[in-house]
Amino acid sequence: MAQATISITVNGEAKEVEATTTGVELFAEDKNIIAVKINGENRDLYTPLNDGDTVDPIALDSEDGLAIMRHSATHVMAQAVQEVYPNAKLGVGPVIKDGFYYDFQVDQPFTPDDLKDIEKRMQRIIKSSQSFRRRSVTEEEALKEEADQPFKIELIEDKEAHLDPAAATEISEKELSFYDNVDRDGNVVWKDLCRGPHLPNTRYIKAFKIERSAAAYWRGSEKNPTMQRIYGTAWATKEDLKAYQTRLEEAAKRDHRKLGAEMDLFSFPDEIGPGLAVFHPKGAAVINAMEDYSREMHRKHHYSFVQTPHITKGGLYETSGHLHWYKDGMYPPMHLDEEKDADGNITKPGADYYLKPMNCPMHNLIFKSRQRSYRELPLRLFEFGTVYRYEKSGEVHGLTRVRGLTQDDSHIYCTREQMKDELTSLLTFVLNLLKDFGLTDFYLELSTKDPNKYVGSDEIWEEATNTLAEVAKESNLELVDDPCGAAFYGPKISVQARDAIGRTWQVSTIQLDFNLPERFQLEYIAKDGTHQRPVMIHRALFGSIERFFAVLLEHYAGAFPAWLAPVQVLGVPVADEFAPHLAGFVKSLEDEMVRCEIDYSDDRFGKKIRNASKSKVPFILIVGEEDMNNNAVSFRFRDGSQLNGVPVDTAREQILTVIKKRVQVNSADDFNAAVAE
């Protein structure tokens, strides 16, 4: 006899319900509930419940709810595409940050008109209130149903497809399933291979937008066919969608590529190649300010500065493991040093040299260059080391993803006993330095072992991961898990910073490594005279100079604080006869290493002021007749406010004070507050 009731826990409360109960009945009164979490796993609202289950609701406007809704939107989009292109071959349709995409193989790239048509068809599908219905299938059944879909067949036959983040939306490790789109008459009008979960029906998709299309390689490999990828976004309400679009508009204004060109900071000449930035004088001035302050702070924290070459023999990366685990991200080798006699016979074999993708192996050689004592530990090695990563041309993006990058790279060697204290002080150092650059809103991400890509024992990984987690939790910052996100040699903490418009950027990384010291046979003499392995900590505060430059440029929308600004003072004489007085004052600032310019152009004074305002210079200094007669200058700030007739000695001291304090000044009020403190 079937069990009449079952005992479950709902929202932490024990309940006795009918055995046929699902989430549909449990949460019937709350129309914002679109799915359930059963024993910690996201499931469809109509999933049968079992005795002893723990059930929690998933609201549409929650993080999980938005992800489910966006994934349902990918199905609606794919259905709409196949209405227009019945022969379109389907790839994958995962959820991404703030949106989703689906990959298609079609004869021609999608046009803007195609995207408009697809969006209209999606609206019709949504209004038709189609239900999403899951059904489990065998592999044989799945292959039969997807006989005309080669990319789906590949996923079905790939027993490790569930490990691919994009393919994991389609394939579960446990079982295969399809989702049918069922109309009001009960007819299946479309279907897709998918693990789910999904919305109860399409009408829960209340606010969406098709954004753009682009070419993409199937499963991210340039060896695979090219697909056409359509991106979209979906939100719980139309107000949320509008707010997102407003954020995009603001982000577009702050795009570092746009600002970099407008402010003459950097460029990417075709003659050099994609992903290889050239910094112009003004951009280099910002880089120098960043590096100079970083050097100052590293000296105060007892780091030893080193410098290493840009290329090395491949054997070094054989030892480190990079050639095994990271070769696809490295540039091809250069075969050098081979010698031949007159007959072409090799008399001295050559060696493969590589552009370095990482600095850590070279720092290990510095540690290993002589015998080390416990008295030297912790040993903190630091360099601004330029490394090279082979990024695909379609994946490079401004300064945030480049092929040549300079890391503020440090490797710290310490004892196991010193490890936790070193990590704690290091995290404090990182956060304080980022705050000095104007970033103040952080959370931490803990990246753990990828079971298919790691070196060393499970025990070592567990100890390293637990230590990092303990240090992260003691910081009192939010800690988010990043499963399988670690590099092959150790777990890491990433500092995620939110910028002025709420976007999240990964900046600093702190990685704990027991494995490379083992691979390089690093040792120190302990207090008892025994030879011991040091613990190694990899650390980059900026991540890379280029990426951090881009983050700051967008965070400040080009209006850097005075200490970072490419031009700190711009002089504008009211007329030519006042230029000598202004030049004399500017010279006194330049003697104090202030970055200054004077507008000697033939433009009218009003145009000079407009041009100066567009340049986002923190201090515009104006000199007219009254200023000259009183040995004074007048300030104009970014918001248009002014301070007139400031004596030159006072003005010079105040400018130097604001620069030294590293505070942001956009107005006369900001300026007065900064110099008064």
From Swiss-Prot:
Gene Ontology MF terms: ATP binding; metal ion binding; threonine-tRNA ligase activity; tRNA binding
Family annotation (SUPFAM superfamilies): Class II aaRS ABD-related, Class II aaRS and biotin synthetases, ThrRS/AlaRS common domain
Keyword RNA-binding belongs to the record: yes
Location of the TGS domain: 1-59
A cellular component term, taken from the record's GO annotations: cytoplasm
UniProt: Zn(2+) binding residues: 360, 411, 538
HAMAP family: Thr_tRNA_synth
Protein name: Threonine--tRNA ligase
UniProt organism field: Bifidobacterium longum (strain DJO10A)
Name of encoding gene: thrS
